[in-house]
Amino acid sequence: MNTSAPPAVSPNITVLAPGKGPWQVAFIGITTGLLSLATVTGNLLVLISFKVNTELKTVNNYFLLSLACADLIIGTFSMNLYTTYLLMGHWALGTLACDLWLALDYVASNASVMNLLLISFDRYFSVTRPLSYRAKRTPRRAALMIGLAWLVSFVLWAPAILFWQYLVGERTVLAGQCYIQFLSQPIITFGTAMAAFYLPVTVMCTLYWRIYRETENRARELAALQGSETPGKGGGSSSSSERSQPGAEGSPETPPGRCCRCCRAPRLLQAYSWKEEEEEDEGSMESLTSSEGEEPGSEVVIKMPMVDPEAQAPAKQPPRSSPNTVKRPTRKGRERAGKGQKPRGKEQLAKRKTFSLVKEKKAARTLSAILLAFIVTWTPYNIMVLVSTFCKDCVPETLWELGYWLCYVNSTINPMCYALCNKAFRDTFRLLLLCRWDKRRWRKIPKRPGSVHRTPSRQC
C-alpha cells in the first residue's frame, strides 16, 4: 500500500533508456510482474477473508479492509503502468491516461496514509479512553471515517491533477513523460513530501509510543492487582466483594430463593459480563451478558463452595439444587458452571484486565508491523526528495526508479503483516489457498479469561 501520496516521477530524469539490454528488460519485467501478482493475490485474500470469515468482521479490520482496497488498486493499475513506463522509456498512452493514472495513484495512496492514521488514533483512544471511546466505536462510525478519508483524498488530489493545466492555461509536462504538472518545482515537491510523509510518520510514531507506554502501565497495574490476591477459604482468592454465607454448625439452611436473589446483584453479574464490542480479531467468543432479552427455559448455574461443607446435611439437600447454586437465563438452553469456586470481584477484574491487555497488545503488534513496513519502504524515496530539493543532480536516476518502486512494494508487504500478526487472517489465508474453506468445521470454544464450561441446563 502506498501510505503516502506517491511522489511524481522527477521531470529532470529520463526514464529507462531505450538502449536497455534484453536481459535487463526481461529481469525488470519478470520481477515487477511477480510483485504485482503477489500484491493483487495477497490483497484479494484479505477482501475474501473478510467476506467469508465472520470472525474478522471487527472494527479494527474495517480499517485494514480499506487499506487492502487501496493496495489492490496499486497492485492492479499503478505497478503495471509504471513498469510499462520504465520498460518503454517513455509514456506512450497519451495525456489523458497519464493524468488518470496519477490521479488514481495519488488518491489511493493518500487514502491509505489517512487510514493508517485512523488506525493509530483508534488504537490510541481505545487504550487511553476505553470506556468513553469504545461506547462510540461502532462499524457504522468506522465506515463513516473511512469514507471521509477517501473523500478528502479525492478532493485534495484528483481535481488538481486533472485540471491544473486548464487553470494555468497550458500543459507544461514534457512530451513522452508523465508527472504531475504542479509538482515540477522541487520546493513544491518538498512541501508535499513533508505534508504527505514526514508529518504523518511523526504523528503515528508519537501515538504508537503513547500506546506502548500505556500498555506497559496496564501490565504493571495488572501485576500489582494479581499480586494483591490472597488465598481464601475454599481454594479461591479472597476479595472485598465476597458475600458472607451462614454456614456454622446448627445454623439453618439458606433458602435457595434467598441465595438466588443475593447472587443476582448487579455487581456479581458485572464480574461475568463481557461486552460484545470487545470481540476482536482471533476467535469467535461468546459473550455472557445480563441483558433482559434472553430466552427463558435455560439458565446459568454457578456453583459456589460452602463455608463449612461438613455442617451441611446431605439429606436435606434438594435433588436438583443447593443453597450454593445461582441461576440465571442464557440464550441457548445450556448452563455455565464454575465448580468449586465463588466468583470473586478482584479475581474477575484481574481476568478482564488480562483479556483486555492481551487484546491491546495484539492490536498494537499489527499496527507496529504495518507502521514499520510503511517507514522502511517509503523513507528512501522521501530522503531523495529532500536531497534533490537542494541538489538537483545528486540523485542518480536508477535510485529514483528503485525508490519509487520500493514505495509500491509496501502494498505487497501489508497482507503479510496481517497474516503474521493475526492468527485468524493466517488460518483463513491458508484454507483459501488450499481450497479447503468449505470443508472447515467451526467449533465455538470459549477463549476469554474466566470462560466457564457449558453443560446441559438444569433447574434449581
Swiss-Prot record:
Tell me yes or no: is Phosphoprotein among this UniProt entry's keywords: yes
Q: Main site of residence? A: membrane
Any one GO CC term of this protein is: postsynaptic membrane
UniProt biased composition (Low complexity): 238-247
Q: Which cysteines form disulfides? A: C98-C178
Please describe the quaternary structure of this protein. Interacts with GPRASP2. Interacts with TMEM147.
What name does UniProt use for this protein?
Answer: Muscarinic acetylcholine receptor M1
Originating organism: Sus scrofa (Pig)
Gene this protein is translated from: CHRM1
